[in-house]
Amino acid sequence: MKARVIIMLKDGVLDPQGEAIKQALTSLEYNKVNSVRQGKVIDLELNESSEEAAIDSIQEMCEKLLANTVIENYEIKLL
């Protein structure tokens, strides 16, 4: 079973990498970009028997390792 985890900084958390990207885009004359938020995408392939078991397992991975839940939110998508 394949899954994708999308990890983004929570609203209100400063995103210096996103701001650096925005400034670089502006310097390249992409002046219509109002803001940029950078995140992470992690693709996983699991040996789970059910979608529910896969989601439970991935949630545990996110809580323990993949995401810093103090400042990041994550979204799980089964592919």
Task: Give residue spans per PLM region.
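Long, contiguous binding/interaction regions
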Residues: 2-4, 8-39, 54-55, 59-79
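Short beta-strand-to-loop capping motifs
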Residues: 7-9, 43-49
